[in-house]
Curated annotation (Swiss-Prot):
One Pfam match: CTP_synth_N
Free-text activity regulation comment from the record: Allosterically activated by GTP, when glutamine is the substrate; GTP has no effect on the reaction when ammonia is the substrate. The allosteric effector GTP functions by stabilizing the protein conformation that binds the tetrahedral intermediate(s) formed during glutamine hydrolysis. Inhibited by the product CTP, via allosteric rather than competitive inhibition.
Pathway: Pyrimidine metabolism; CTP biosynthesis via de novo pathway; CTP from UDP: step 2/2
Binding site residues for UTP: 14, 187-192, 223
HAMAP family hit by this protein: PyrG
GO BP term (any one): 'de novo' CTP biosynthetic process
PANTHER family, sorted: CTP SYNTHASE (PTHR11550), CTP SYNTHASE-RELATED (PTHR11550:SF0)
Catalysed reactions, semicolon-separated: UTP + L-glutamine + ATP + H2O = CTP + L-glutamate + ADP + phosphate + 2 H(+); L-glutamine + H2O = L-glutamate + NH4(+); UTP + NH4(+) + ATP = CTP + ADP + phosphate + 2 H(+)
Chain's gene name: pyrG
Protein name as annotated: CTP synthase
Length: 545
């Protein structure tokens, strides 16, 4: 079967939820037996989000093959079974870098390099490559129609629709239909102007997803259909809902999936959304509530920890618990003390980079360890837990990470300077290397030690988890820390790197170098987060007893 393409754009304002809408449609089509993937095209000039500020851009989502991508790819993986890869996300910066590399290499035979055709051809080639072997590929274009940055992407998709045939392409446009309280009605004019903007660059939308805080009345949908030149059945009302996992059913109830299948002439069974119904039932009927403190350095923007937030909620679904997340700035722990941690059922310290707020995180780990509060450390959250244990239990009072103190006399965490790639080539990396090139990225195998809590939680000897870090546990000082009681419960495939640590004489104190949040989904959850939330409930019950 030839690949069919759905191009998703947004208009009027940003943050309408293009990624959620695209992922929700993909989940319905997947439930109909189709092989679906989703791509995100980001117009910004950065090569990838890897070095962008989490407080501006949100989290960096890491794929199985080690790509540092937009957080929307996390949404995609949480909604569909198909896994994302490097091919599923690219930016203007990546496109321009590749075109300039080809120009320097002489691939264009001295031609004058222009946006059309060279940039647009590169975009089209990547979209086609990313969709190979799929029944449907949904392509989301970041930003808002009318932005200067997105014009080459929209032009490339317009051309691609001509190249592959309009019968194999569908343009889906999200717009805002605001409700004006003083008028007592929704207004369609912003949608009409947004479609006019699209038409000016040669794109006629086939489907309009109309975002509003309420269901859009039938007469207003007819008006939108008339003035925007789309079938009435292709004007979809997408109101605000209490859970993003309700959106697949909302789209299916308006037969969007049927419209898509009819358009592409796809013969496939009706979608079975019973798994999503179960998710919504568990979400709506919790048997209790736990409060988990997330102590981080980017807490002013919760999207900086998007996958962690979602993984905690997924674990709540598994345990039939409502998870209340209390965000605490680790710098506040340094200035106001650990009193900010009082009353929590569990504590989580997520990943991060740089020295700011680190001592607050170390004090947080100490507080959790000494007060028998369930603790989950992720990436940096593991490293600071190790530093805390080394200082306060193992007697290594000068323990630190060379990331925070390069002259540290007891660097229990250090930079690995020699890395071996899949081909066996050794690459030297130092603190002077480009930031994007010094990471241990993507899925790595981890072996779990018999008799540990980690082995019990996972129920397996070997697991695969995703990494994003450049510093590791220093094996030279590790024996001293282990002799003081800390247990290494997970190691890398070659048994050389520490992946998981735990405190044996603590009810639940586990920290991992990898990022388990990237593989958690609402339908399946993740064993580490499920165990953590269950431990939070047990701790809560013990305090009430």
């Amino acid at each position: 079967m030839a690949t069919n393409y759905i191009f998703v754009t947004g208009g009027v304002v940003s943050s309408l939820g293009k990624g959620i809408a695209a992922a929700s449609l993909a989940s319905i089509l997947e439930a109909r037996g189709l092989n679906v993937t989703i791509m995100k095209l980001d117009p910004y000039i950065n090569v990838d989000p890897g070095t962008m500020s989490p407080t501006q851009h949100g989290e960096v989502f890491v794929t199985q093959d080690g790509a540092e991508t937009d957080l929307d790819l996390g949404h995609y993986e949480r909604f569909i079974r198909s896994k994302m890869s490097k091919a599923n996300n690219f930016t203007s910066g990546k496109i321009y870098s590749e075109v300039l590399r080809k120009e320097r290499r002489g691939d264009y035979l001295g031609a004058t390099i222009q946006v059309i055709p060279h940039i647009t051809n590169e975009i089209k080639a990547r979209v086609i490559e990313g969709g190979k072997g799929r029944d449907v590929v949904i392509v989301e274009v970041g930003g808002t129609v009318g932005d200067i940055e997105s014009l080459p992407f929209l032009e490339a998709l317009r051309q691609l629709a001509v190249d592959v045939g309009r019968e194999k392409t569908l343009f889906m446009h999200l717009t805002l239909v605001p409700y004006i309280p003083t008028a007592g009605e929704v207004k369609t004019k912003p949608t009409q102007h947004s479609v006019k903007e699209l038409l000016s660059i040669g794109i006629q939308p086939d489907v309009l997803i109309c975002r509003s805080d309420r269901t859009i009345p039938a007469n207003e949908r007819k008006k939108i259909a008339l003035f925007c030149n789309v079938p009435e059945r292709a004007v979809i009302s997408l109101k605000d809902v209490d859970s993003i996992y309700r959106i697949p059913e909302l789209l299916k109830s308006q037969a969007l999936d049927s419209f898509v299948c009819d358009r592409f002439r796809l013969e496939c069974p009706e979608a079975d959304l019973s798994e999503w119904e179960q998710v919504l039932y568990r979400q709506a009927n919790p048997t209790g509530e736990v409060t988990i403190g997330m102590v981080g350095k980017y807490v002013e923007l919760p999207d900086a920890y998007k996958s962690v937030n979602e993984a905690l909620k997924h674990a709540g679904l598994t345990s039939r618990l409502s998870v209340n997340i209390k965000y605490i700035d680790s710098q506040d722990i340094e200035t106001k003390g650990t009193e900010l941690l009082d009353g929590l059922d569990a504590i989580l310290v997520p990943g991060g980079f740089g020295y700011r707020g680190v001592e607050g995180k170390i004090r947080t780990a100490q507080y959790a360890r000494e007060n028998n509060i369930p603790y989950l450390g992720i990436c940096l959250g593991m490293q600071i837990a190790l530093i805390e244990y080394a200082r306060n239990v193992a007697g290594l009072t000068e323990a630190n990470s060379s990331e925070f103190d390069p002259a540290c006399s007891q660097p229990v965490i250090g930079l690995i300077t020699e890395w071996q790639d899949e081909s066996g080539n050794v690459e030297t990396r130092t603190d002077k290397s480009d930031l994007g090139g010094t990471m241990r990225l993507g899925a790595q195998q981890c072996h779990l030690i018999e008799g540990t809590k980690a082995r019990e939680i996972y129920g397996a000897e070997a697991i695969v988890e995703r990494h994003r870090h450049r510093y590791e546990v220093n094996n030279v000082l590790l024996p001293t820390i282990e002799a003081a009681g800390l247990k290494v419960s997970g190691v890398s495939a070659d048994r050389k790197l520490v992946e998981i640590i735990e405190v044996p004489n603590h009810p639940w104190f586990i920290a991992a170098q990898f990022h388990p949040e990237f593989t958690s989904t609402p339908r399946d959850g993740h064993p580490l987060f499920a165990g953590f939330v269950a431990a939070a409930k047990a701790y809560q019950d013990s305090r009430k007893a």
